[in-house]
Amino acid sequence: MALIEGVGDEVTILFSALACLLVLALAWVSTHTAEGADPLPQPSGTPTPTQPSEAMAVTDSIRGEAPGAETPGLRHRGQAAPPEPSVGLAATPPPPDSPQEPLVLRLKFLNDSEQVARAWPHDTIGSLKRTQFPGREQHVRLIYQGQLLGDDTQTLGSLHLPPNCVLHCHVSTRVGPPLPPCPPGSEPGPSGLEVGSLLLPLLLLLLLLLWYCQIQYRPFFPLTATLGLAGFTLLLSLLAFAMYRP
């Protein structure tokens, strides 16, 4: 007696084996994960303290020498010692036009909308455009106090911008020239392996296998199984014709 009425046992066993193989393949793919790389050890920034024994050895060697003798070690240390600054000279203050904090800029557009940008004084006009408008820096014009900032190599520190200053921004919407059409023989093909394109060949291969089993083992295929196989063949033929027709 057949396991499923109207379907032969060979067909049932074949579909069961295919289902088991599919489940095993999905389980293997889901568990196939790459191990993460181990983090690199961070170098220790703690300096090694100086051993006190070295200082004691230097002191003992100095005491053992004669008072009038001059050792090479003392001469070397005397030459390497930096000169002490005189009392009358004051330290040079840092220049007032080199702030350490970033500049806060307000980019104002034609529709009165604003955008806050942060930049450093050593940044250039071109780097500011690339940071705030990636891919559109060629269509952006910055205006400060009625002057067009057209030199992209000019630094922000040279402009002496005050905090929270307003830079008027004009973004051009002009579209570039259209690209020439590609020749018929150089059309880019699909990249990568498409799973959908493999479904129809697999179904055709399975259909051929079923028809081979139906011919070789005709007693195991009743009339209902043969009619179902013929209907499936007709449906798959229409699908293949619809997909591959010019």
From Swiss-Prot:
It comes from Bos taurus (Bovine). It is a multi-pass membrane protein. GO terms for biological process: ERAD pathway. Residues 35-102 are annotated as: Disordered. Involved in sterol-regulated ubiquitination and degradation of HMG-CoA reductase HMGCR. Involved in positive regulation of AMPA-selective glutamate receptor GRIA2 recycling to the cell surface. Acts as negative regulator of hepatocyte growth during regeneration. GO terms for cellular component: centrosome; nucleolus; postsynaptic membrane; recycling endosome. This is Transmembrane and ubiquitin-like domain-containing protein 1. Residues 103-176 form the Ubiquitin-like domain. It is found in: Membrane; Postsynaptic cell membrane; Recycling endosome; Cytoplasm. The modification Phosphothreonine is found at residues 71, 92. Pfam families: ubiquitin (PF00240). Residues 2-30 are annotated as: Required to release iHOPS from membranes. The chain crosses the membrane at residues 11-31, 195-215, 221-241. Interacts with EEF1A1, GRIA2, GRIP1, CAMLG, TUBG1. Interacts with NPM1 and CDKN2A; TMUB1 can enhance interaction between NPM1 and CDKN2A and is proposed to bridge the proteins; proposed to be mediated by iHOPS. Interacts with ERLIN2 and AMFR; TMUB1 promotes the interaction of ERLIN2 with AMFR. Residues 40-50 have a biased composition (Pro residues). Keywords: Cell membrane, Cytoplasm, Cytoskeleton, Endosome, Membrane, Nucleus, Phosphoprotein, Postsynaptic cell membrane, Synapse, Transmembrane, Transmembrane helix. Gene3D superfamilies: Phosphatidylinositol 3-kinase Catalytic Subunit, Chain A, domain 1 (3.10.20.90). Its main location: membrane. PANTHER family: PROTEIN C7ORF21, TRANSMEMBRANE AND UBIQUITIN-LIKE DOMAIN-CONTAINING PROTEIN 1. Disulfide bonds: none annotated. The modification Phosphoserine is found at residues 98, 127.
